């Protein structure tokens, strides 16, 4: 059976290689994730848990990135006993049950962190999370040594959301229109605007959330919309992973069948990879 903690001390190089080989068109996300995760895991006494909020359209790589993080910490990756995935529409479907969900969520997190300090919690579909629910986990994310005799400082919380995606796309499109490379986009072009737009978005799951108010989210990580060349990279890797011979003509054909926006310029893929 797998041990709590991690499969080995995390190798920054292995994480970097995984991100480079598998996550395309996301120079900002790669850099933030690499530094945040490797820095956090090499710190024997973190002051608070690591909290990452990943933002962008469907298909840009948010789930994939959280899978890569999990696999670099635990052999079993997302199937590890120490990695817990919550999907808003599946686990918290009814607005009328928010009080019950809050209690369940607190008990689940407390129980799992008691069993393993290095637990990973992933919240998918944050934008479909009922307002106020996520504030239930605030005590676990704060700068407390212990809460009810449990220390949460080695845990990792990852939030995935489409909220803020319009803002990210606007910035990417502005760069494209002014003839700049997307790699010139800096985190500072995004991060503040992202936090504000998510905080003020009634449908973000973080609407007026104390997690943002109190600066408890360590990193807002933007995932940019993908271009034609990135789709081809995704398709190539997918063909290889399924054992097919890589055929550039087929790759181009598949990529061209995707829909792109804006309608005239056709710069970004509608559905990502």
Swiss-Prot record:
GO terms for biological process: cell adhesion; chaperone-mediated protein folding; ERAD pathway; intermediate filament cytoskeleton organization; neuron projection development; nuclear envelope organization; nuclear membrane organization; organelle organization. Keywords: ATP-binding, Cell projection, Chaperone, Cytoplasm, Cytoplasmic vesicle, Cytoskeleton, Endoplasmic reticulum, Glycoprotein, Hydrolase, Membrane, Nucleotide-binding, Nucleus, Synapse, Synaptosome. InterPro entries: ClpA/B, P-loop_NTPase, TOR1A_C, Torsin. Glycans are attached at residues 97, 112. N-glycosylated. Residues 45-205 are annotated as: Interaction with SNAPIN. It catalyses: ATP + H2O = ADP + phosphate + H(+). Gene3D superfamilies: P-loop containing nucleotide triphosphate hydrolases. ATP binds at residues 56-63. GO terms for molecular function: ATP binding; ATP hydrolysis activity; ATP-dependent protein folding chaperone; kinesin binding. Its EC number is 3.6.4.-. One of its GO terms (cellular component) is secretory granule. It holds the Pfam family TOR1A_C. It is a peripheral membrane protein. Disulfide bonds: none annotated. Its main location: endoplasmic reticulum. It is found in: Endoplasmic reticulum lumen; Nucleus membrane; Cell projection, Growth cone; Cytoplasmic vesicle membrane. Belongs to the ClpA/ClpB family. Torsin subfamily. Protein with chaperone functions important for the control of protein folding, processing, stability and localization as well as for the reduction of misfolded protein aggregates. Involved in the regulation of synaptic vesicle recycling, controls STON2 protein stability in collaboration with the COP9 signalosome complex (CSN). In the nucleus, may link the cytoskeleton with the nuclear envelope, this mechanism seems to be crucial for the control of nuclear polarity, cell movement and, specifically in neurons, nuclear envelope integrity. Homohexamer. Interacts with TOR1B; the interaction may be specific of neural tissues. Interacts (ATP-bound) with TOR1AIP1 and TOR1AIP2; the interactions induce ATPase activity. Interacts with KLHL14; preferentially when ATP-free. Interacts with KLC1 (via TPR repeats); the interaction associates TOR1A with the kinesin oligomeric complex. Interacts with COPS4; the interaction associates TOR1A with the CSN complex. Interacts with SNAPIN; the interaction is direct and associates SNAPIN with the CSN complex. Interacts with STON2. This is Torsin-1A. It comes from Cricetus cricetus.
């Amino acid at each position: 059976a797998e041990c709590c903690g991690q499969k080995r001390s995390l190798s920054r190089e292995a994480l970097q290689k995984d991100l480079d080989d598998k996550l395309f068109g996301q120079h900002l996300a790669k850099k933030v994730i690499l530094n945040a995760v490797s820095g956090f895991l090499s710190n024997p006494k973190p002051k608070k848990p690591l909290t990452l909020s990943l933002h962008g359209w469907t298909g840009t790589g948010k789930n994939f990135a959280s899978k890569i993080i999990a696999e670099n910490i635990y052999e079993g990756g997302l199937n590890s006993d120490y990695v817990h995935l919550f999907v808003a529409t599946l686990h918290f479907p009814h607005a009328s049950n928010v009080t019950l969900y809050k209690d369940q969520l607190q008990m689940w997190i407390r129980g799992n962190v008691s069993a393993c300090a290095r637990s990973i919690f992933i919240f998918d579909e944050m934008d479909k999370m009922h307002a106020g629910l996520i504030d239930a986990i605030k005590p676990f994310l704060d700068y407390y040594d212990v809460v009810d005799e449990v220390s949460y400082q080695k845990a990792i919380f990852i939030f995935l959301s489409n909220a803020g995606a319009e803002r990210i796309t606007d910035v990417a499109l502005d760069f494209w229109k002014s003839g700049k490379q997307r790699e010139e986009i800096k985190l500072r072009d995004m991060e503040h605007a992202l936090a504000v737009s998510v905080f003020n978005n009634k449908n973000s799951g973080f609407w007026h959330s104390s997690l943002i108010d109190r600066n408890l989210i360590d990193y807002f990580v933007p995932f940019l919309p993908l271009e034609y060349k990135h789709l081809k990279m995704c398709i190539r890797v997918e063909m290889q992973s399924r054992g097919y011979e890589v055929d550039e003509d087929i790759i181009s054909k598949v990529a061209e069948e995707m829909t792109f926006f804006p309608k005239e310029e056709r710069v970004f893929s509608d559905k990502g990879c």
